Amino acid sequence: MASPRHILLINGPNLNLLGTREPQIYGSTTLHDIEQASQTLASSLGLRLTTFQSNHEGAIIDRIHQAAGFVPSPPSPSPSSAATTTEAGLGPGDKVSAIIINPGAYTHTSIGIRDALLGTGIPFVEVHVSNVHAREAFRHHSYLSDKAVAVICGLGPFGYSAALDFLGRHMKF
C-alpha cells in the first residue's frame, strides 16, 4: 500500500498570535485550532499533514529545504530561534508532496522564501487569513503568488481547509 501523500503546512511570523492579534482582521480562531482542524481534514482526505510555524525567515527556508530532503546547515545558537513543528521524528529525508504556506509579512518581503520554494520544486498553495488586497497598499504585492499553484485569501481560517481540500481532491502528485 502506498504511503499517504505528505503535506507541509507552514505559518510565518506572528501567526502564532492568531486568536488574539487584531481579531477584527484575523478573527478569534487560534493557530492551534487551525492546525487541529487541518489535521482532521487531512486525515479524512488520506493525507499526512505536518505543521510548522516560525517567526524567523531562515527557519522557514530551512524547513522548506528539509521538505525536499535537503539537510539544512547546522543552526547558529540563538535563544530566539524557536520554531514549532507538530510532528515528531521528521528527518532531513522526510520529503513532502506539497506545501501550504501562509508566509505572513514575509509575503511582501522575502525573496529568500520564494527562492527556497522554487529551488525545491515542491508545488505550493499560498494562503492568507485576511484579504490582503483590501488592506494597506504594501500588502498588495506577493513574492510568491506568481509561482503558486493557487492563492487563497480573505476566507479566514477556512482558507486552510480550502487549500487542503484542493490538494487532496484535485491535485495529482
From Swiss-Prot:
Pfam families: DHquinase_II
Enzyme class: lyase
EC number, UniProt record: 4.2.1.10
Catalytic activity: 3-dehydroquinate = 3-dehydroshikimate + H2O
Binding site for substrate: 102, 108, 115, 129-130, 139
Database matches in InterPro entries: DHquinase_II, DHquinase_II_CS, DHquinase_II_sf
Bridged cysteine pairs (disulfide): none
Amino-acid biosynthesis found in the keyword field: no
Active site per the UniProt annotation: 26 (proton acceptor), 128 (proton donor)
Induction trigger: Expression is induced in the presence of quinic acid. The quinic acid (qa) gene cluster is subject to two levels of gene control: a primary system which responds to the presence of quinic acid via the qa-1S repressor protein that blocks the qa-1F activator, and a secondary system which represses transcription of qa genes in the presence of a preferred carbon source such as glucose.
Gene3D superfamilies: Dehydroquinase, class II
Functional pathway: Aromatic compound metabolism; 3,4-dihydroxybenzoate biosynthesis; 3,4-dihydroxybenzoate from 3-dehydroquinate: step 1/2
Function: 3-dehydroquinate dehydratase; part of the qa gene cluster that mediates the catabolism of quinic acid (QA) and as such, allows the use of QA as a sole carbon source. Catalyzes the second reaction in the inducible quinic acid catabolic pathway by converting 3-dehydroquinate into 3-dehydroshikimate. The qa cluster encodes 3 inducible enymes (qa-2, qa-3 and qa-4) catalyzing the first three reactions in the catabolism of quinic acid to protocatechuic acid (also known as 3,4-Dihydroxybenzoic acid).
PANTHER family: CATABOLIC 3-DEHYDROQUINASE
Family stated for the protein in its record: Belongs to the type-II 3-dehydroquinase family.
Self-association state and partner proteins as the record states: Homododecamer. Adopts a ring-like structure, composed of an arrangement of two hexameric rings stacked on top of one another.
Descriptive protein name: Catabolic 3-dehydroquinase
Species the sequence originates in: Neurospora crassa (strain ATCC 24698 / 74-OR23-1A / CBS 708.71 / DSM 1257 / FGSC 987)
Encoding gene per record: qa-2
